[in-house]
Amino acid sequence: IQSTSMDQGILTEDSMNSFIRTLIQAGIWKNKVPKQMARTKDGTQTTVKKSEAEADATASQDTRLGFQPIVSVDAELLRQQRRFSSPRVLLSENTPLEPPPLYLTEEPVALNRTSRRKREGKSHRGEYSVCDSESRWVTDKSSAVDIRGHQVTVLGEIRMGPS
């Protein structure tokens, strides 16, 4: 799922919960594919569920090798979820050309003096990126320096629910 900054509407809590439920049902939330496609002798495709032990063994092997899976979202799921929009997140099939802007433009466009006074200087939009100390955009990193200068660990997977 790619996120970019776009003003497309307000996202209600109920619609977000519904969307998260859809992601969990699709097996995307935990970076797992619940079913795997297999071909039979006559060439037709069938779905085969992986056993839980087999899935855990694969996950632990991937963790030892330092592999962090990239979640791939089916284009059909994105088309179904177009109504879920927010000013900060956009579900898209395309990879963004550049990272989202972290600050508003320095020069206000509006002629209204009240608005201009409010926007003087850089105002922070509340968007945070994972970046290193040289302020370069980082896409695949396991540790980083946060906005306060502290060394932090970037999680490859977030586990939810009881362990």
Swiss-Prot record:
Residues 4-119 form a propeptide. It is found in: Secreted. The keyword Cell inner membrane does not apply. Its main location: secreted. Residues 1-3 form the signal peptide. Glycans are attached at residue 112. InterPro entries: Cystine-knot_cytokine, Nerve_growth_factor-like, Nerve_growth_factor-rel, Neurotrophin-3, NTF3_N. Keywords: Cleavage on pair of basic residues, Glycoprotein, Growth factor, Secreted, Signal. PROSITE patterns: NGF_2. Residues 38-60, 90-131 are annotated as: Disordered. GO terms for biological process: cell surface receptor protein tyrosine kinase signaling pathway; modulation of chemical synaptic transmission; negative regulation of neuron apoptotic process; nerve development; nerve growth factor signaling pathway; neuron projection morphogenesis. Pfam families: NGF, NTF3_N. One of its GO terms (cellular component) is synaptic vesicle. The keyword Glycoprotein applies. One of its GO terms (molecular function) is growth factor activity. Seems to promote the survival of visceral and proprioceptive sensory neurons. Belongs to the NGF-beta family. This is Neurotrophin-3. It comes from Eunectes notaeus (Yellow anaconda).
